[in-house]
Amino acid sequence: MSQSDTIFDYKHIWHPYSSMNNPHPCYTVISAKGVYLKLKNRKYMIDGMSSWWAAIHGYNHPVLNKALKKQIRKMSHVMFGGITHPPAISLCRKLISLTPEKLDCVFLSDSGSVAIEVAIKMLIQYWQALGQKRKLFLTIRNGYHGDTFSAMSVSDPKNSFHQIYHNLLPKHLFADAPVSSFYKNWDNEDILSFKKIIEKNSFKIAGVILEPIVQGVGGMNFYHPMYLKQIKILCNHYSIPVIFDEIATGFGRTGKMFAFEHANVVPDILCLGKSITGGTITLAATLTSRHIADTISKGKVGCFMHGPTYMGNPLACAVANANIKILKTNQWKIQVLNIEKQLFKSLMPLINHPYVTDVRVLGAIGVVECSRSINMISIQKFFVENGVWIRPFKKLIYIVPPYIISPHTLKKLTNVISNALNKTELFI
């Protein structure tokens, strides 16, 4: 890669959450293997982010690569309208087998945000088919569900990612976020805000949507499983369907295959993405019950009105099948448990640091919440120079490493975080 390529990128390519007038530096990765990203200067970085939660088995995994190569010899893509193919059928079988018995209808899409859009549209059509024009959704503060319009509308409007669009988005209902954390005692007052809203608006609410147990970039909070149980009880009482957004947490990240298993509850609609293909290629899925699917199909329109061009892409489905095969045959639960134990041991002592207000660990997720805002450019440079890739935001330094990371390599990640806290110039 030449210097002119770098200059071209700087001038013409818009990266996520970046300015074209004053873009943050981008670091050129030329290859990746295992937990390592190789830079153009031939140096290596330990990936602490799994490419935004996705690469759970690391990079260049032979089983995933083999699945891609085998499929591409047959076909890389074919439209899914009026056509089906073995990789999609096999994947949907596996997803139905992995998830609770109730979820037996699968809609495939090409990104997590689209999976959320699909879930929301499903419930709007569901109520239309029942003769009710419900379009209001209830969710909780500090939530994040993606960057497309419907996904933004059910994300916390106080979230700085979406504030600029607030007046343009559909208005929904937001209950207070739970205060009871995952490992602390349950406080029954946590459910009161949600209960009050659902009691007052039950006849208008099309559905409830939330991230089970782990709230992602809305604040990286881990809330008590009892909150999820109480929500499901209330929703069942008022016959309001529940959407669980497991796009970030699905496929083992919290120590369970799906985060909702911590509460022993089942959603009416489940959204999956990110690590569904082991971080190899983009794919997402929205699963729902036969009842919801049949109700939509019996409505005035007679079908569900959605169909992405790359829906059910054979390459993506093939590698997703391989990813699930790995999860069924390897020791991912032990891997995640070992990561969790080490993160507790390495990160929890940082709670005594003057720049730290909280430390949170669950499964293969570690979060250090700082008392001061982070200087993104400075801290990113510090991390890269120290051989790790960590992408903080706001006041949060968090890691979600690949499950295959070794104890020695994970220790380096956490040591660099600890060292960063001692650099005052990295904070604002």
UniProtKB/Swiss-Prot annotation:
Gene Ontology MF terms: adenosylmethionine-8-amino-7-oxononanoate transaminase activity; pyridoxal phosphate binding
Pathway assigned in UniProt: Cofactor biosynthesis; biotin biosynthesis; 7,8-diaminononanoate from 8-amino-7-oxononanoate (SAM route): step 1/1
Positions with a binding annotation for substrate: W52, Y144, K274, G307, R391
CDD domains assigned: OAT_like
NCBIfam families: bioA (TIGR00508), PRK05964.1 (NF004624), PRK07986.1 (NF005940)
The keyword Zinc belongs to this UniProt entry's keyword annotation: no
Binding site for pyridoxal 5'-phosphate: G112, S113, D245, P308, T309
Cytoplasm keyword on record: yes
InterPro entries: Aminotrans_3, Aminotrans_3_PPA_site, BioA, PyrdxlP-dep_Trfase, PyrdxlP-dep_Trfase_major, PyrdxlP-dep_Trfase_small
Family named by the database record: Belongs to the class-III pyridoxal-phosphate-dependent aminotransferase family. BioA subfamily.
Function according to Swiss-Prot or TrEMBL: Catalyzes the transfer of the alpha-amino group from S-adenosyl-L-methionine (SAM) to 7-keto-8-aminopelargonic acid (KAPA) to form 7,8-diaminopelargonic acid (DAPA). It is the only aminotransferase known to utilize SAM as an amino donor.
Modified residues (N6-(pyridoxal phosphate)lysine): K274
Organism per entry: Buchnera aphidicola subsp. Acyrthosiphon pisum (strain APS) (Acyrthosiphon pisum symbiotic bacterium)
One Gene Ontology cellular component annotation held by this UniProt entry: cytoplasm
Annotated positions for site Participates in the substrate recognition with KAPA and in a stacking interaction with the adenine ring of SAM: Y17
Main location: cytoplasm
UniProt-listed PROSITE patterns: AA_TRANSFER_CLASS_3
Organism superkingdom: Bacteria
Quaternary structure annotation from Swiss-Prot or TrEMBL: Homodimer.
Compartment(s): Cytoplasm
Enzyme Commission designation: 2.6.1.62
Cofactors required: pyridoxal 5'-phosphate
Keywords: Aminotransferase, Biotin biosynthesis, Cytoplasm, Pyridoxal phosphate, S-adenosyl-L-methionine, Transferase
Name of the protein described by the UniProt record: Adenosylmethionine-8-amino-7-oxononanoate aminotransferase
Catalytic activity: (8S)-8-amino-7-oxononanoate + S-adenosyl-L-methionine = S-adenosyl-4-methylsulfanyl-2-oxobutanoate + (7R,8S)-7,8-diammoniononanoate
GO biological process: biotin biosynthetic process
